[in-house]
Amino acid sequence: MVAYRFLTLISLGLGSHCASALQYGYNQVSTHKDSAVVAGAFPAINGTHLQSPAFTSPGTVPRGFSDGTSGPTRDETMEGFMRRLARSNSWMTYHKADFKSEEGRKFPYMYLSASKSSIEKPSSHKLRVWLQGGVHGNEPAGDQSMLALLGDLAANQKWAAKLLEKMDILVLPRYNPDGVFYFQRYLATNFDPNRDHIKLARQQTRDIKELFARFSPHIATDMHEFTAGRAFGPKKDIIYAADALFSSAKNLNIDEGIRQLSEKLFAKRMGKDIEAAGLRWDPYIIQGESSSSKLLLREAGTDAKIGRNAMGLSQCVVFLCETRGIGIADQHFERRTLSGLVMVKSILQTAVDNFDEVYNTIERGIRRFTNSRNDIVLTDRSPIMERTFGMLNTTDATLFDYPIDFATTTPAQAVLTRSRPRAYLIPPSWPDIVKRLEVFGVKADKLPHSYVGPVEALNVTSVTFDKEYYEGVVTTTVETKLVERNIRLPAGSYLVKTNQKNAALAFVALEPENIDSFASFGVIPVSTGDQYPIFRVE
């Protein structure tokens, strides 16, 4: 108890975002199920038949699911389900990753293909699709919707065959098995798995990202849930009405054609498909702080530390798909899982129905990005507009459109840009930086000889510490001035060329002004007056 109080005092002193202290394991949120009035606005959808373990084998659901202390599907139940499907369907292959979680749990995944392709040898002229769930362990409709998709494909062979004519699919249903075991958001070490995509603090993050980079998908989805009971308004009597919130990748260093494809084709179709299923949706948002009396909601941001943008920076179409479920235990679970299933099926069907447009747009976007000499974007802003957002009154379950200020990232507006270097030079004393880049799928050439010549260097003019302690570091905001100089670096230095598909991940990591850069997270520590030890080659 003394230790717990000590941690609580630390968290309260470090900032408002540290709402409570964490312990080892079982960091579970409070359960507040919907009242009967609110629950009436989220009825079961007639004709729903979900082909996943929680619904086909209800006897396997742990008791703790009903009170919010457990998810519905244990690891062994999930693995047995996946193995049975693979045995019965030649186009489904069950795999276990060659790495394990922080507590030694396995990562089973399914590879779906109508040909003899594999991750290492993909089919030619087919879309590669990566689907993941269970990133946060207390969001069970995320991985359950992935299992429901597998069951649906097995039950609808013609539909599966139609999809697999045009794509190969990798399904990783449970990204965070330790978090699922403890029914907590975090990894076993209490790092947030969805905030570790650039700093790469945990080996588990690196292992999964290396698998992702090897597969090199054209399309990816990340299945989550959002807090059901978050209340707004002067009386705290209105909540989000949506069953589903979704967002594409927003970072401005993603090819514009790929971002436009996400918004104008996939997002529009997804909204229509959600409504056709009798469900409600809105764009994914978080609450912001506003100086006015009007509620400010911020659309999903551009920060690369989040999986949606980190995956998108490999120049692919990515969607974060969220369903209404955190904090309500097993309530409405069928409707929640259906919401996730509808979204992922919409993405797959849209890709197949528009295969030529989707495949060619993404491939052209990759080539355009790889060969581009356009400036890169280091910081951006979200312009604020007025709009309405679907809300539900908790006193009488009235559905209505609520006026809000909306900080939009469709698109964000660039603030600080810089010329795109042809390469970065990294001294041999920083092999850990190179290793991180290689995890991203960025190639680095080790120079057999010394490098002597002109470079662009960055002199640090300002380092401002943020007010909060975040996952072991106090992050910084760094400002620099670009200068030209001649440099001599020894043999064994690294040259990272930027005419490669995943170079945008190098941009956000290596340019110190970026909010998620290695400098910001102290991976490359700098102080005012220093010269940043990574150099740009023009």
From Swiss-Prot:
Zn(2+) binds at residues 136, 139, 224. Residues 71-351 form the Peptidase M14 domain. It is found in: Secreted. Its main location: secreted. One of its GO terms (biological process) is proteolysis. Its EC number is 3.4.17.-. Residues 1-21 form the signal peptide. GO terms for molecular function: metallocarboxypeptidase activity; zinc ion binding. Belongs to the peptidase M14 family. This is Carboxypeptidase 2.
